[in-house]
From Swiss-Prot:
Belongs to the ABC transporter superfamily. Carbohydrate importer 2 (CUT2) (TC 3.A.1.2) family. GO terms for cellular component: plasma membrane. This is Putative ribose/galactose/methyl galactoside import ATP-binding protein. It catalyses: D-ribose(out) + ATP + H2O = D-ribose(in) + ADP + phosphate + H(+); D-galactose(out) + ATP + H2O = D-galactose(in) + ADP + phosphate + H(+). Part of an ABC transporter complex involved in carbohydrate import. Could be involved in ribose, galactose and/or methyl galactoside import. Responsible for energy coupling to the transport system.
Length: 515
């Protein structure tokens, strides 16, 4: 089937034909190790046609490692994969794709300087009679695919100009374009809005009707019970079990995942009464946001809520000097402050954990140690020498405090799970000893156990007098952690709510532009 034909197969959804084999995909006793770490130990998994299998587990449980084995990125040390009952081995991701397995990665893998059409059909470009790439035909195929998926994007738009949510939809379109029997979705909703989640779920329902098998990795309980037929749980590299989704509730699923009962997810805190640290008045960035005013006190957690495109992240980046403001006033410790670049912000005690760790946080080719030390390196260097022993001791201490799971500090950070990468980045900024910590989506892609750890850490930092600004798309997180909640809509501050008046209904009302 050619590229356009595979795309058009979504157009008419005929009832799935029951296959002779009971399973599309089987994983039998697969093991995989890395230096100093057993990532998988004799795990198993089975995917039925026309079903969604949710794969759950804490960060480091082995979920992503197994998916990379299925997708041909890693090779297993032992065990067997079967596709429609036949043993298979995939030496490369291309081999897995050609066999009918497509994967949507948690960290998006698109070419930013290429168009949407070029990204979707890369390696499968339509050619004309002269053997040249037929850009017109590629455009037509892409437009047809996007239309059938109800994705409103221009096929010729450069991917680098898209939002994270739009890039995620392009990844989904690309995976669907292969007409694969098995689709692996690794945290597909981590960066998209509730409306786009509903859109994705409708696409998944269409794929189920065609007899496709979906492996759906997520940390969001509500999604599991909304979309999954079965749930498989991994813990510490081991397969714990598989159950029908309708036979589980949230507490039993969490218990399977973490091997223990979780205490209250959001720590109980008394509202702090600290000194005024930061005063912002009428802050604006032309064409992006305007009229943003707020106060921030020591020991306070200020949440910022809003839909995607509301300007939340832009406010954080302006406060940190990434995009200097076009007007307004920032006052720190009673003194007017102009923050023209991140170096100035760090000097004044600000730190920013960005929303996209791959794009603007990690140095993927460097070690855990090198990624953690980069923000404090100037303080440990002088006279042509670096105080390596002191730096290592500091990084080791932060790894222990934040429970960063890594075989060693020399390990390439790109090999860690998403949650451990996030904790390493948080450690980087805590080593600068900030007075104001700005967190943009701090628990995106992190499992429920790790979330509880992050929440306790944030509460502890606030209890020690640190001021925290927390941006999040998860309303329970904003409401559960914040002393006050700012709500933005299309670049405007709609209101600031105290904890006792901040409800999901009221926040969503303001986030939608309704007073």
């Amino acid at each position: 089937m050619n590229a356009c034909a595979s795309a058009s197969s979504l157009h008419s959804l005929s009832p799935a034909v029951a296959p002779q084999e009971p399973y599309l995909l089987e994983v039998l006793n697969v093991s995989k190790g890395f230096p100093g770490v057993v990532a998988l130990a004799n795990v198993q998994l089975r995917v039925r046609p026309g079903t969604v299998l949710a794969l759950m587990g804490e960060n480091g449980a082995g979920k992503s490692t197994l998916m990379k084995i299925i997708a041909g990125i890693y090779q297993p040390d032992s065990g067997e994969l079967r596709l429609k009952g036949r043993p298979v081995t995939f030496a490369t991701p291309l081999a897995a794709l050609q066999a009918g397995i497509a994967m949507i990665h948690q960290e998006l893998n698109l070419m930013p300087h290429m168009s949407i059409a070029e990204n979707i059909w890369i390696g499968r470009e339509q050619q004309n009679r002269l053997g040249l790439i037929d850009h017109r035909e590629m455009h037509r195929c892409t437009a047809a695919l996007l239309a059938r998926l109800r994705i409103e994007l221009d096929p010729e738009e450069q991917v680098g100009n898209l939002s994270i949510a739009e890039r995620q939809m392009v990844e989904i379109a690309k995976a669907v374009s292969y007409d694969s029997d098995v689709l692996i979705m690794d945290e597909p909703t981590s960066a998209i809005t509730d409306k786009e989640v509903a859109h994705l779920f409708s696409i998944i329902a269409d794929l189920k009707a065609q007899g496709k098998g979906i492996v759906y990795i997520t940390h969001k309980m509500n999604e599991v019970f909304a979309i999954a037929d079965e749930v498989a749980v991994f813990r510490d590299g081991a397969y714990i079990g598989l159950q029908r989704a309708d036979s589980l509730d949230g507490d039993s699923l969490i218990s399977m995942m973490v091997g223990r009962e979780l205490s209250q997810l959001f720590p109980l805190r008394e509202k702090p009464i600290g000194e005024l640290l930061l005063k912002v008045r009428d802050l604006r960035l032309d064409g992006v946001f305007k009229g943003v005013s707020f106060d921030l006190h020591a020991g306070e957690i200020l949440g910022i809520a809003g839909l995607m495109g509301s300007g939340r992240t832009n406010v954080a980046e302006t406060l940190f000097g990434i995009t200097p403001s076009d007007g307004g006033e920032i006052v720190l410790d009673g003194q007017p402050l102009r923050i023209g670049d991140p170096h100035r912000a760090i000097e004044k005690g600000l730190a920013l954990l960005t929303e996209d760790r791959k794009l603007s946080g990690l140095f993927p080719c460097l070690s855990v140690l090198e990624n953690m030390e980069v923000a404090v390196l100037p303080h440990y260097a002088g006279g042509g020498f670096v105080q390596q022993k002191a730096l290592r001791a500091l990084c080791e201490d932060m790894c222990r405090k934040l429970r960063v799971k890594t075989p060693s500090l020399e390990q390439c950070i790109d090999t860690l799970s998403g949650g451990n990468q996030q904790k390493a980045l948080l450690a980087r900024w805590l080593m600068t000893q900030p007075r104001i910590l700005i967190l943009d989506e701090p628990t995106r892609g992190i499992d429920v156990g790790a979330k509880a750890e992050i929440y306790r850490l944030i509460a502890s930092l606030a209890g020690e007098g640190m001021a925290v600004i927390m941006i999040s798309s998860e309303l329970p997180e904003v409401l559960g952690m914040s002393d006050r909640v700012m709500v933005m809509h299309e670049g405007q501050l709609m209101g600031t709510l105290d904890r006792n008046e901040a409800t999901q209904e009221r926040v969503m009302q303001l986030a939608s532009g309704l007073n």
